[in-house]
Swiss-Prot record:
NCBIfam families: hpr-ser. Residues 209-218 are annotated as: Important for the catalytic mechanism of both phosphorylation and dephosphorylation. This is HPr kinase/phosphorylase. It catalyses: [HPr protein]-L-serine + ATP = [HPr protein]-O-phospho-L-serine + ADP + H(+); [HPr protein]-O-phospho-L-serine + phosphate + H(+) = [HPr protein]-L-serine + diphosphate. InterPro entries: HPr(Ser)_kin/Pase, Hpr_kin/Pase_C, Hpr_kin/Pase_Hpr_N, P-loop_NTPase, Ser_kin/Pase_Hpr-like_N_sf. Homohexamer. It comes from the Bacteria. Mg(2+) binds at S168, E210.
C-alpha cells in the first residue's frame, strides 16, 4: 500500500475529533511513519492496525481494557522485555482505548523513546474499524479526470469531451431538470473497493460550475441544497464527440468501456450537433444503462429477434418448408 507522507501527526489531526484522541506521550515522535517495506507488503488496511500484537510490531497497536489488564498482570521484567521489543521496532504510534488510563511505566517508556501514545474513550474495536477505514481511503488508488460529474437518476455519470463541446452547458441543463452536481472541470476519483470507484469534488471547486459567457455559478446558492451532491459512485461515462468524428458508430454492436483505475466503466458516445437535445439523450443513456445492469439488453434482444426471423424465413423457403 502507498502511504507516502502519512505520519503520526497527520493521522492524529485527521482523527482526533472523531475518536476523541488525546496525545499523552511521545510528542517528539510526531513525524513517526510506517516502515516502508512493511507498508508495501501490506495488502489491506487490516494489516496496518489492530489489537496489541508482538508478532506484527510495525503496525498501529491498539490496547483496550483486556490488553491493559494482561499487561498489568505481567511481572516487571516481562513488561520491560515485551514493551522493549515492541518499541524497539518503532510502531507508528500506540492507542490506549476503552477509556482506560495508560500504565505509568508504559507512558514513561513512550516518552523516553519518542513513541507517540494516544488515548481514547471509545472502544478499541471502534477505534480499529475507524482507523482501518481511514487508512484504506488515504492509501487507495486515485486519479483526477476532466469533465462534469453528475448524479442522474441516482447514477454517477461523468460527461467528458473536447473543450468547447458544451459539457458545462449540458450539466447546467441537467441540473435544471432536477439532477445533482458533484463536480465540474476536475473530478477526484478514488477506488475504494474491488468493484466501485467514488468521485468527489476538490474543496476549492465545491458547488461551482463554470459556463462560458456566464462565468462561475454557485449551484447550491442558485438551485438549492438538493442540486449538489458530496460524492457518487461512477457507473457511466458519456463521451461527447463532434459530428464529423470518423470513429463514431451509429449502432455499436459491442459495449464500450473506459478503464478508470483498473476498473472498466461503461461508456456511450453522443454526437454534438445543432438541434439535438443532449439532456434528453443523456437521460435516455442513463435509463438504458440501468436496464443493462438489471440484465435487459435491448440491442441483444433485437439481434435475437432478427436472427429468429431470418431462420424462420429461411425455413419457409427451403424445399422441406414448402412441403409443409
Amino acid at each position: 500500500m502507498e502511504l507516502t507522507g502519512v505520519i503520526a501527526q497527520s493521522i492524529f489531526d485527521d482523527n482526533a475529533a472523531d475518536l476523541k484522541l488525546s496525545w499523552v506521550a511521545g510528542l517528539e515522535g510526531a513525524d513517526r511513519a510506517f516502515d516502508v517495506d512493511f507498508a508495501k507488503e501490506a495488502t489491506s488496511a487490516a494489516d496496518l492496525v489492530g489489537h496489541l500484537n508482538l508478532i506484527h510490531p510495525n503496525r498501529i497497536q491498539v490496547l483496550g481494557k483486556p490488553e491493559i489488564t494482561y499487561y498489568q498482570r505481567l511481572s516487571e521484567e516481562n513488561r520491560k522485555r515485551q514493551m522493549g521489543e515492541l518499541i524497539l521496532l518503532e510502531p507508528p504510534f500506540l492507542v490506549v482505548a476503552d477509556g482506560v488510563d495508560p500504565p505509568p511505566d508504559l507512558e514513561l517508556r513512550c516518552t523516553r523513546s519518542s513513541t507517540p501514545l494516544f488515548t481514547s474513550p471509545i472502544s478499541s474495536a471502534a477505534v480499529i474499524d475507524h482507523l482501518r477505514l481511514y487508512l484504506s481511503r488515504i492509501s487507495a488508488p486515485r486519479v483526477t479526470m476532466h469533465g462534469v460529474f453528475l448524479d442522474i437518476l441516482g447514477m454517477g455519470v461523468l460527461i467528458m469531451g473536447d473543450s468547447g463541446l458544451g459539457k458545462s452547458e449540458l450539466g447546467l441543463e441537467l441540473i435544471s431538470r432536477g439532477h445533482g452536481l458533484v463536480a465540474d472541470d476536475a473530478v477526484d476519483f478514488v477506488r475504494l473497493g474491488p468493484d466501485f470507484i467514488e468521485g468527489r469534488c476538490p474543496p476549492l471547486l465545491q458547488n461551482l460550475l463554470e459556463v462560458r459567457g456566464l462565468g462561475l455559478l454557485d449551484i447550491k446558492t442558485i438551485f438549492g441544497e438538493t442540486a449538489v451532491r458530496r460524492k457518487m459512485k461512477i457507473k457511466l461515462i458519456v463521451q461527447l464527440v463532434r459530428r464529423n468524428d470518423g470513429e463514431f458508430e451509429r449502432l455499436p454492436l459491442d459495449s464500450q468501456y473506459l478503464d478508470v483505475l483498473g476498473l472498466p466503466i461503461h461508456m456511450v458516445k453522443i454526437q454534438v450537433a445543432a438541434g439535438r437535445n443532449l439532456a434528453v439523450l443523456v437521460e435516455a443513456a442513463v435509463r438504458n444503462t440501468i436496464l443493462r445492469l438489471r440484465g435487459i439488453d435491448t440491442l441483444r434482444d433485437f439481434m435475437d429477434r432478427q436472427r429468429a426471423a431470418m431462420q424462420a424465413e429461411a425455413a419457409s423457403h427451403s424445399p422441406q418448408g414448402r412441403l409443409l
